[in-house]
Amino acid sequence: MSLNRILVINPGSTSTKIGVFDNERPVLEETIRHDEEQIGKYKRIIDQYEFRKETILEVLHSHGINISKLNAVCGRGGLLRPIEGGTYTVNDAMLEDLKNGFSGHHASNLGGILAYEIASGLNIPAFIVDPVVVDEMEPVARISGIAGMERKSIFHALNQKAVARKVAEELNHKYEDLNLLVTHMGGGITVGAHKKGKVIDVNNGLNGEGPFSPERAGTVPVGQLVEMCFSGEYYRDEMVKKLVGQGGLVSLIGTNDAIKVEQMVEKGDPEATLIYKAMAYQVAKEIGGASAVLHGKIDAIVLTGGLAYSKILVDEIKERVDWIADVIVHPGEDELQALAEGALRVLREEEAPKEYIVREKETVARG
C-alpha cells in the first residue's frame, strides 16, 4: 500500500490543532496556542489566515517535517452553504464563501483557506471533510409548524460520520449499507438518523432543538420562551446565551463540567442526580424519536463524544433504548484523525472528491 502523507488543520478561536499523518498513522499532533493579544489585532477572523499559516509552517519546521513530502492538506470545513457529506476539493467558490462568511463568521472558516494556501504552493490538493453544514435531510424532515420556518441541519457531522464508518467496519459492513442512530454528546448533543450513508434527519444541536446538554438548552417550552423574550428584562444577545452557552447544565446546576456533576451524583446530591438523569432521559427520548425516522430498522445505536466516557450517563441511556438495537459506545472524538481519513479515502480513490458549486441560490455537490 502506497504511503500518503497528509497535513491536517483544525482552527479554533484561540488555537490551531495540526496533525501530520502517514496514511492513518499520526506522525505529529500539536495544539498551537495563539496569544489572545495577537489574535485581537485582527478585525475579522478571516484576516488571521496569513499569521496562522506562518505559525503552522514554523511549527512543522521545528519538528523536522518536510512539507515537500506532503501529498495533501485537509482543513476543517467552515460555515458554507448546505452541502451533502463527503470530502470536497477546496476551490474558488468555496474560498469566496469562506472569506465572505456566507453562513457566518467562525474560526473553522480558516480551515479550508489555510489548507488551500499551503497546498497551492506545493501543487497538491486541498480538501475539507464533512463540515457542520452537511445537510442530507429529507424534505419531510424540514417542515416545521410555522410557514417560512424550516428545520435546519446543523450538527457534529465530522465526528458522527467518522464514528459511523468505524462502527460499520467493526460490523463488517459498509457505512452506506447500514441504518445507524448516532448520538454525539459533548458541549452540544445531536442525534442523527443515518440511512445508508445519509443523515436524513438530525436535531439542530446549536439553536435550541433536542436534548439539553452541558451548555445548551435544547428544546424548551416555546410559550414560556416567547414570554421571556418580550418581558423587557433581557436583550436579544442575553436570550441567545440562555439557549447556547448558558443553558443546559450551566443554567440548571451552575457548571458545564459533567465530571463535577457526576461527582455530585456519586455523593448522593438529589438535585444533581435528577438533572443528570433528565439529560440522559432527553437523549434517550431523542433516540427513540429518531428510530421512527428509520421505521425501527436500526442496525446499531452509537454513543460518541466526550460525555460517552460517563458510565452513569451511558448506562441511563442504555436502559431506555437498548430494546431498539444494540448500543455501541465510542467515547471521545478525534477530529484530526477524521479529517485525515476523509482525505485518505480520496487519495486512495475509494471515493471521488466532491466539488463545491454555487448556482444562483443553491449549492450542489458533484461527485
UniProtKB/Swiss-Prot annotation:
GO CC aspect terms: cytoplasm
Designated name of the protein: Probable butyrate kinase
Subcellular location(s) of the protein: Cytoplasm
Enzyme Commission number(s) of this protein: 2.7.2.7
Annotated InterPro entries: Aliphatic_acid_kin_short-chain (IPR000890), Aliphatic_acid_kinase_CS (IPR023865), ATPase_NBD (IPR043129), Butyrate_kin (IPR011245)
GO terms under biological process: acetate metabolic process
Family under the similarity heading: Belongs to the acetokinase family.
Catalytic activity line of the entry: butanoate + ATP = butanoyl phosphate + ADP
Domain of life: Bacteria
GO molecular function terms listed in the Swiss-Prot or TrEMBL record: acetate kinase activity; ATP binding; butyrate kinase activity
